[in-house]
Structure formats: C-alpha cells, structure tokens
C-alpha cells in the first residue's frame, strides 16, 4: 500500500470521527445560549 493512500485514509477517518463530535460540541454550546 502507498503511504499517500494510508495518509488519506487516516485523514478521512479522523475527519469522519471528529466531525460529529466537534459539530455536537458547537451545537451544544449554541443551544445553551
């Protein structure tokens, strides 16, 4: 496997994994206002 491909997969995994958490945190802060 190419390191570039692995890097892209890791990046996508991090974005998909952290995206909902970040959005949820921002939504929670906005909702508490």
From Swiss-Prot:
Span of the signal peptide: none
Compartments where located: Plastid, Chloroplast thylakoid membrane
Spans through the membrane: 5-25
Pfam families to which the protein is assigned, alphabetical: PSII_Ycf12
Purpose: A core subunit of photosystem II (PSII), probably helps stabilize the reaction center.
Family: Belongs to the Psb30/Ycf12 family.
Domain of life assignment: Eukaryota
Biological process, per Gene Ontology: photosynthesis
Keywords: Chloroplast, Membrane, Photosynthesis, Photosystem II, Plastid, Thylakoid, Transmembrane, Transmembrane helix
Organism: Ostreococcus tauri
Quaternary structure, from the entry: PSII is composed of 1 copy each of membrane proteins PsbA, PsbB, PsbC, PsbD, PsbE, PsbF, PsbH, PsbI, PsbJ, PsbK, PsbL, PsbM, PsbT, PsbX, PsbY, PsbZ, Psb30/Ycf12, peripheral proteins of the oxygen-evolving complex and a large number of cofactors. It forms dimeric complexes.
Protein name: Photosystem II reaction center protein Psb30
Classification of source organism: Eukaryota, Viridiplantae, Chlorophyta, Mamiellophyceae, Mamiellales
Topology term for the membrane: Single-pass membrane protein
One Gene Ontology cellular component: chloroplast thylakoid membrane
């Amino acid at each position: 496997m190419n390191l570039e491909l692995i890097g892209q997969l890791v990046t996508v995994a991090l974005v998909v994994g952290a995206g909902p958490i970040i959005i949820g945190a921002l939504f929670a802060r906005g909702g508490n206002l």
